[in-house]
A protein has these predicted regions:
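Short, flexible, mixed-charge glycine/proline-rich loop motifs
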Residues: 498-506, 535-539
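Extended C-terminal regions of large enzymes
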Residues: 411-495
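Right-hand nucleic-acid polymerase module
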Residues: 1-2, 370-429
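A conserved non-catalytic segment of reverse transcriptases
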Residues: 226, 232-235, 319-383, 389-392
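Charged boundary/loop elements
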Residues: 24-83, 149-165
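Histidine-centered nuclease catalytic patch
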Residues: 514-547, 551-553, 557-558
Length: 560
């Protein structure tokens, strides 16, 4: 009995020792060096792709996917994103430094078998329908993140120039600017627009096409594609489409749709010698802009727009995809069309881009839900914090278009909803009492919904700032300084007051990792000395950090 106890005690001690060692190794990873080493290989993959040396691409991808630093970065991505607390079918979470290090050491392509996805259903934006979502295991997510590091340099190099969705350094505002350039000139710009809608793009891409055309390890890709999913304890196979909820899925979808622009250029912009001819380009006025699976084609006549539609239909059919005839329509620019949450329409030959009615209704619905349902019992400062998050996100997205009227309307809606919220809380109090309790004078502004510490953002105070479109040929792996400057400039445009000062002082770099930050992505303020001790928000004590970096920093301090 004593011998058995001693053996168990020894194994426990050994396990604790191993965990301590793995934990220390994870905490001591040099993330700067990891980024540099992986980026060095990615640059070589880009150059090999440009030279069409696909044997070199394959060799370099192998080196990258077998690199410890790439594996560590893949695990880091999985354990710091929003789904880090959501397990797959195996119920496993990597929630300690030791588990993360063990995971990084265990990633391998040898005998790799992807586990089925866990199927859940989440509400769509209209809340009337639900859409399926597949949740891979942590291990499968990390494998996808690892192979995405090797595939993305190829995807960025071969991508259509006017493709802007799910790509590094590109955004919906870039797509908007390119459409503005194509449609804004008086009496010269194209009059007709083909609004494209692909039926269930991510769900129906042909596996045969992907396996034949995507330049990556075919066995690994097949595992990603054929994993299947489990719903209500029953296993279902996947015969088409990209992995739902998968990290690599947007890259696969983009690579599937890349080539539409080239096909349109060959048909409408080139002469009999196969060279781009400005005469054809100016006569046909065919332009193409795509964001993920949403696209727009401009044309001089409705007949040319319909011809473009047929070319795209043929292109998609080879990939197992088809257009929705009901939603793929040809529209005159004077009647207007919606794209990416904006309405594009000409009024007396002047192009106006503004938030679409659907986008305005959506934000009003979300704010109403926050105030009257979720926030009915919240304290005022909590409600202000939640509303400010929603308002900032919406105004940041729309501040590069003609949004002043929409912003003013949103201010009016906010006031009406907040007054209803206050009346519900104090049904026996009069208007004067309610207004005195919740609305105050702040600086030169009257009637500000505020507390001692927080105040509600005034929506129409958001400055309208024209977005600077990206160079269509820019590559994020080669033009590093260009992309870093764009990120910094975006922060300088979006931020105000002390937050702009902090951003400027740090040159837009994360205080923890030293890597560039994107002002539109997750970031937070880190206090050098705890705010509880200083009691003030002095910019000298404040630094911007990535949320993911702050989580790692806090975790490492906690485990010490």
């Amino acid at each position: 009995m004593n011998d058995k106890y001693s053996t168990t005690e020894g194994k426990t001690s050994e396990k604790l020792s191993d965990e301590a060692m793995l934990s220390a190794q994870w905490k001591n990873i040099d993330w700067h060096k990891a980024e540099r080493e992986v980026n060095r290989l990615q640059i070589r993959i880009v150059k090999a792709t440009q030279q069409k040396d696909y044997n070199a691409v394959k060799r370099l991808q192998y080196l990258l996917t077998h690199s410890f630093y790439a594996k560590a970065l893949a695990v880091k991505r999985v354990v710091t994103n929003d789904g880090r607390r959501t397990p797959g079918v195996d119920g496993v979470l990597w929630n300690t430094p030791a588990k993360k290090m063990a995971a990084a050491l265990s990633l391998t392509d040898k005998r790799y078998r992807a586990r089925p996805l866990r199927r859940v259903y989440i509400e769509k934006k209209d809340k009337k329908k639900k859409r399926p979502l597949g949740i891979p295991t942590m291990y499968d997510r990390a494998m996808q993140a690892l192979y995405a590091l090797a595939l993305e340099p190829v995807a960025e190099t071969t991508a259509d120039g006017k493709s802007f969705g799910f790509r590094k350094g590109r955004c919906a505002q870039d797509a908007c600017e390119y459409l503005f350039n194509a449609l804004s000139r008086k009496h010269i710009s194209p009059k007709w627009v083909l609004e494209g809608d692909i039926k269930g793009c991510f769900d129906h891409i042909s596996h045969d096409w992907l396996l034949a055309n995507i330049p990556m390890d075919k066995n690994i890709l097949k595992q990603f594609l054929k994993a299947g999913f489990i719903y209500q304890r029953e296993l279902f196979p996947t015969e088409e489409g990209t992995p739902q909820g998968g990290i690599i899925s947007p890259i696969l979808a983009n690579m599937t749709l890349d080539g539409i622009e080239k096909k349109l250029v060959e048909r409408f912009h080139t002469n009999a010698l196969g060279k781009v001819d400005s005469r054809f380009k100016n006569a046909h006025k065919v332009n193409f802009v795509r964001y993920a699976d949403d696209f727009v084609v401009t044309a001089a006549t409705p007949e040319l727009a319909l011809e473009a539609k047929e070319l795209i239909r043929e292109f998609l059919a080879e990939r197992g995809l088809e257009l929705s005839d009901e939603k793929t329509v040809v529209t005159n620019i004077d009647d207007g069309f919606d794209f990416l949450g904006w309405n594009f329409r000409k009024y007396n030959e002047k192009l106006i881009i503004k938030p679409s009615q659907k986008a305005v209704k959506a934000i009003v619905s979300n704010i109403s839900d926050t105030i009257l349902r979720r926030g009915k019992a919240w304290q005022q400062d909590v409600l202000i914090m939640k509303l400010n998050e929603q308002i900032r996100g919406w105004t940041n997205y729309h501040q590069s278009v003609c949004a002043s009227d929409a912003f003013a309307h949103l201010d009016y809606v906010l006031y009406e909803l907040l007054w209803r919220w206050a009346k519900r809380r104090h049904p026996k109090k009069n208007k004067c009492w309610i207004s005195t309790k919740y609305w105050h004078r702040v600086g030169n502004r009257n009637w500000v919904f505020s507390t001692e510490n927080k105040e509600l953002i005034r929506v129409d105070s958001t400055a309208i700032v024209r977005h600077t479109k990206i160079k269509a040929t820019a590559n994020p792996f080669l033009d590093v300084a260009y992309f870093q400057k764009r990120k910094f400039d975006k922060g300088m445009h979006r931020l105000t007051g002390k937050f702009k000062t902090i951003w400027k002082n740090q040159n837009g770099l994360c205080y923890h990792c030293g890597m560039p930050m994107d002002v539109t992505e997750e970031r937070e303020i880190f206090y050098l000395a705890p705010k509880a001790k200083t009691g003030t928000e002095d910019v000298r004590n404040m630094r911007y950090v990535h949320c993911a970096c702050q989580r790692i920093y806090a975790e490492n301090r906690l485990k010490k």
